[in-house]
Amino acid sequence: MLDLHSLPSPLRFLSLVALLAAALSLLGAPPTMAQQAAEGVVQSEAGRPAAPGRTGLPLPRFVTLRADEVNLRTGPGTRYPIDWVYRRRGLPVEIVDEFDTWRRIRDWQGTEGWVHQSMVQGQRGILVTGKRHALRRRPEPNAPGVALVDAGVVGVLQRCQVDWCEVTLDSFTGWLPRDAFYGLYPGEAVE
């Protein structure tokens, strides 16, 4: 048996460190980054995914919520707590990151969190913002109105021209100025 007292001080210290490391590995110390990588779960030091799996779709991108209730979680998995519950099918959100089957989304207020991929769909939607707007029959400021639309109304984005977009809100279809709603990037073309 090795007598640690007979070793010089630096070697004694290294021997103690090696023994401590071996003991911790036997006690089930938390997995290292290398162990997590081997299991396909790489996380940064902040606990967020460091190497998310990519679908090949552009990031960020707009999508809509698929269900009437969608749990927004603090991380990509059911083990993470629910931070917020959206209760608005068709609400437009941005996907800003992806990890496995989870999508990090951002809403119109800048709130971010994780939802399962099954809770979003590729259909483009809008959320009317600001004040009351006239939904127009044509993409012109003086065109006849189809309906008056209040802030908070959710609809479907059909297509866009330079300054106007055609949208469907319930049973009404018409044109709104691009700056009247959330759900579209500046200069983005939608056909």
Language-model region placement:
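N-terminal secretory signal peptides that target proteins for export/translocation
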Residues: 1-11
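Alpha-helical transmembrane segments
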Residues: 10, 14-17, 86
